[in-house]
């Protein structure tokens, strides 16, 4: 039941991403509006996750999970009947995002309270598998339902599933929590929400606005993109949040986040590795659809089918993760998983081309899924086993906050790699293309230097044909652009492989054995003794 909730809470983001074109047409809006709705969902999740974890300690984990899922169901129902983008924003971005922020931290705390030892490790392996399968299956389900039926049916189905989950959650016992109901730090909640939202917004919009040099930035302070200013604003607010938490602790009042938690080495390692995992996951799932859909021209459903080996391997590896951790230890399993992700990224780099290398691509996808499954199967158990019952929801809030930050960073960093390499390579190809007149090459170089989007070659051809160029010139420019697409994707995949290698550093303080984590449990009482 809890695994079903985990799938549900990650599934519809993938569905929404593959339904953008249909939503634009049916809701009579623009692509930028739907992208704004998707961005807003991420912002709401990031802003409220820490507070959602604290509310789990205050209200009780089962009650908070129930409230979160109920809010999520209302959001799904609102989304299903949305007549326009405004209602879609309220239903999907605000209500579903807030519901997920309440439910997810309590979900992992409920698992921790329901299982012990190896059974807990197995349960978190199942949750990891559920989350990964939701991400990977989403494009298949979304593509099929959107193409054959209606995107609205996905959200109707979510309402039905939530009702089933709510009926089943009554069978769960309330796990142990804090001995005293903690006070809710409202000022801290606002500061953390604003700070995290600004940091995530900067990361998500960096590709559109530009990192430093402005692209489509709404304003250009001092001639720069808005991105660094939004990011710096978020950092300043978060610094204020940290200072406020210290002040409350010194006054003997409950903070939103106990800063002493970050001195817990296994917890810190679990959070950092979770951030790295989602950076890699979202970076790869940003890159792969670009190749399959915009380079090869596959539709959403066929794209999902090509990614199916990821889902299958991820499921198998996640379920096997608990037994592997019992034999080799969580640290070793995570390190092997990260190494497999690195090799898979290099493998995809080697096999992508103008034509799909079907068997080789499927093998690399299976390797990628195996690596992701090994990592995902360990981190929930590491985080929850490093704290005691009183801090589980708080740790869960931090866990999902780290994952949301990683997701935003993955999209931003890999997106910047793709577009930066695409622009540089396309400019170099055009400048060296002797099929083009010198005047055309010079003019194109100026236009390309401002940045080019990643689009399918048919769209590029139509745009060039409308620019009063000859057929030969259009053919040459399209060929140069197609070459630059592959170079851009390969550069990004090389970057992902490098990030996977760097992520090994975050694993240094992960437990070497499954039975090592409980002996390092952190308790809020320990810091106040």
Language-model features: locations:
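C-terminal membrane-cytosol helix-exit motif in multi-pass small-molecule transporters
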Residues: 159-178, 195-208, 233-249, 503-511
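C-terminal module of multi-pass small-molecule transporters
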Residues: 55, 60-69, 78, 82-90, ...
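Transmembrane core module of solute transporters
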Residues: 1-45, 49, 150, 222-230, ...
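Transmembrane-helix exit segments and adjacent C-terminal regions of multi-pass membrane proteins
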Residues: 1-2, 6, 242-247, 266, ...
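Small-residue-rich transmembrane alpha-helices and their cytosolic helix-loop interfaces
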Residues: 6, 38, 42, 122-136, ...
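Helix-loop-helix hairpins in multi-pass membrane proteins, especially solute transporters
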Residues: 57-196, 205, 214, 222, ...
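Interfacial helix-cap and linker-helix signal at transmembrane-aqueous boundaries
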Residues: 23-24, 55-56, 141-149, 203, ...
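Hydrophobic/small/kink-forming positions within alpha-helical transmembrane segments
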Residues: 43-47, 77, 132, 136, ...
